């Protein structure tokens, strides 16, 4: 089933926690944690049956995507009180399909090398809005913030294999440098409840 995620940036002074509480029917609506990059103030995640983007005077900007999973897995289904991370990215137009599939395959292999990724899903976007025409959503769950900011960010597989797709100085570069890296706390797993 298709999924919907929105990274919502609020007007200065807006109450993030109150806004999240008033969102309504969602799988996840949480304020982002410090350290996000173009990741908004709030992450909203729900099933595609309701892909309506919230409309409110408190909203300054939204990056969102409707997407279909192409792969994923679970090392810890039912994870509780962890950290959900969402990366919206755009593969450059004209990239050969075989290259895109290699990028997807190497991204999906990350949890086999980075043990702090507890649950994960990679998806292709079917409908996007915001700063870019997003093509992929890469979601992960961690037991704590240290798993994301430590082992995930510093693992050699990440830097030696996957990062070359994101680095304009590498010949394999295919991902637009403007991306949305966002994360928040959750009470109950979003990816594998």
List PLM regions with ranges.
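Short S/T/G/P-rich N-terminal loop/turn motif that feeds into the first structured element of a domain
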Residues: 1-157, 177-193
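Outer-membrane beta-barrel domain signature
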Residues: 158-167, 171-172, 176
């Amino acid at each position: 089933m298709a999924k919907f995620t929105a990274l919502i940036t609020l007007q200065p002074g807006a109450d993030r926690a109150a806004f999240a509480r008033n969102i309504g029917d969602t799988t996840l609506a949480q304020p982002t944690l410090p350290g996000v990059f173009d990741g908004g103030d709030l992450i909203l995640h729900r099933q595609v049956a309701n892909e309506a983007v919230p409309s409110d005077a408190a909203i300054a900007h939204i990056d969102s995507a409707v997407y279909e999973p192409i792969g994923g897995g679970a090392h810890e289904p039912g994870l509780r009180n962890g950290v959900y991370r969402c990366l919206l990215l755009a593969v450059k137009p004209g990239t050969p399909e075989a290259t895109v599939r290699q990028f997807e395959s190497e991204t999906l292999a990350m949890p086999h090398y980075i043990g702090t990724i507890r649950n994960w899903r990679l998806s292709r976007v079917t409908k996007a809005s915001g700063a870019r025409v997003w093509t992929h959503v890469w979601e992960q769950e961690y037991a704590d913030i240290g798993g994301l900011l430590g082992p995930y960010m510093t693992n050699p597989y990440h830097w030696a294999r996957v990062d070359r797709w994101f680095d304009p100085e590498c010949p394999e570069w295919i991902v637009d440098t403007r991306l949305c890296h966002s994360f928040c706390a959750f009470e109950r797993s979003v990816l594998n409840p």
